[in-house]
């Protein structure tokens, strides 16, 4: 019943039930998808209840059947308020044991950190926004979601999430993910964060390809020219070859 109260935003009932479940050592009981009441509250976008459950002693490290922690879920859905829960302290992030935790490479989840999840979700929204059939209301809704995800990304980075983390399956960093979808706004953000730091960041390989290889292969309507120039301006090496012995220039679409 605690899961139901949390999902419906019934704060008073949730808190009372949580205190009772804590006494029974069942505060982190899981439902059929492996979600604890805390994970249900995060998914239901109930920041006040998230705060209450954590204060009551809910396990912030708990994961569901897909290996998703509260941070992974909040980042994926773009729930900035959940990440900001609490007035001056971001409770979930302050206990940042999950900032660098990877989703297990099972069931199609290629080992993503919460930051990877947020970037991929932002990319997906960009693809939706490019659809020509959207109404003005739909475009506004997507823009709002996009801004919330950007806020989540900034929060994660500000509190210690590493832009250098690679996913388990493909070895990609957030740089590769932003480039492959032509996400120029996030690309600029990550490149500026890296300025004068790691010389290898821009030239790291994923499946043998650098970000510049990926940028060169982009269609021209995905900011290809601007992204290539940005990468070059930040130290991308056009002479690096991939596993097929191709340099980035060889990856460009014909014509």
Task: Identify the role of each PLM range.
Residues 13, 48-49, 81-82, 126, ...:
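Conserved ankyrin/ankyrin-like repeat signature
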Residues 16-25, 51-59, 84-102, 133, ...:
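Ankyrin repeat domain, specifically the short helix-to-loop turn at the C-terminus of the second helix
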